[in-house]
Amino acid sequence: MNALRHTISLVSLGTFQLVRRTRGPHARGFLLGTGLGLASFSAVTYAHSAEAVDPKVNGVQMNTSRFMAEPITDSKALLGDKENMRHRMEILIMEIQAEFCRALEAEENCGQKFKVDRWERPEGGGGITCVLQDGDVFEKAGVNISVVTGSLPPAAVQQMRARGKNLKEGASLPFFASGVSAVIHPRNPHVPTIHFNYRYFEVETAKGEKQWWFGGGTDLTPYYLCEKDASHFHQTLKSACDEHDPTYYPRFKKWCDDYFRIKHRNESRGIGGIFFDDIDSPNQEAAFNFVSSCARAVIPSYVPLVRKHKNREYGNNERQWQLLRRGRYVEFNLIYDRGTKFGLYTPGARYESILMSLPLHARWEYMHEPKSQSEEGKLMKVLKNPKDWV
């Protein structure tokens, strides 16, 4: 029996509401009371029956055991229309979620595992939340996918119009969104935090026309600067971009530097990476392949850094600095992050889930300023003035 541990909380695109638990015909469960950081929740463990068989369509079997849970869309539908971009994106994000979760679990020294929650949304779709908390390597890690449909509220439509989308003002429009999103907060201050998000969006206009686009990015937030790590991270992302267009990396690197700027502090959240949105060219197939390459570059860009630093010694000073920088992370997410804003605009959104990207612990000190020649000061110079790493 393969036990899947389910925990209610979602790091998502910031748009989705948890409504009810999924109980398949081969599932049984029990409730556990627990708590997670800023949110309280219950955990459910399901043991899937050994008699459960992956569905077949035209003799082809989908091996769902490689995923963290059953797909959101019925497996027969996924196999029956594999050329549908909605289905292709769902399979991709399921794969990315499972591969990344297992790569992180392999770095835990004491065998800590992700808890998994598969949830549904009555308006359409659902998601899979994977949470690893209080590990010896990862203090808090969330890796999540969402596949949802619904109607965009007018405020969200207005936000998209501001980005140049040709949508009718004041309308409530049907949409489809799918994506994988992760924020990893390590325990050791010498291991950086990583965030990535890759998504696909469709919206139907008042005239019945369908608009689609991809978005996403991967960025790194170190607490102590290691230039070799920064170069490795950026070079890995650049290689993924260069497979498709040599102009992508410099464009999306600058976009990332601009987007993750904490304007009221005049500093960056981290050392950047790549960031892009509204990608709908040169065609849907090419855009999907580009997003796939970027998503698959996450593990080789990040896991070697975890392995390199996870067992390094550190003291209270390093820990306090890590908490101060996490305070900056909180400031950005609550004030500037587009996904958080989008979620807060969405009626009925599960706000604990939207805020789950926040770290377990953060710190603010009045007028804190590190010495310029200290290791902390070296990081601040780069955060004040982003640089090229490759």
Curated annotation (Swiss-Prot):
Residues 131-140, 329-365 are annotated as: Important for dimerization. GO terms for molecular function: coproporphyrinogen oxidase activity; protein homodimerization activity. One of its GO terms (cellular component) is mitochondrion. It catalyses: coproporphyrinogen III + O2 + 2 H(+) = protoporphyrinogen IX + 2 CO2 + 2 H2O. Its EC number is 1.3.3.3. The record marks H264 as: Important for dimerization. It is an enzyme of class 1 (oxidoreductase). Keywords: Heme biosynthesis, Oxidoreductase, Porphyrin biosynthesis. SUPFAM superfamilies: Coproporphyrinogen III oxidase (SSF102886). Involved in the heme biosynthesis. Catalyzes the aerobic oxidative decarboxylation of propionate groups of rings A and B of coproporphyrinogen-III to yield the vinyl groups in protoporphyrinogen-IX. This is Oxygen-dependent coproporphyrinogen-III oxidase. It comes from Drosophila melanogaster (Fruit fly). The gene is Coprox.
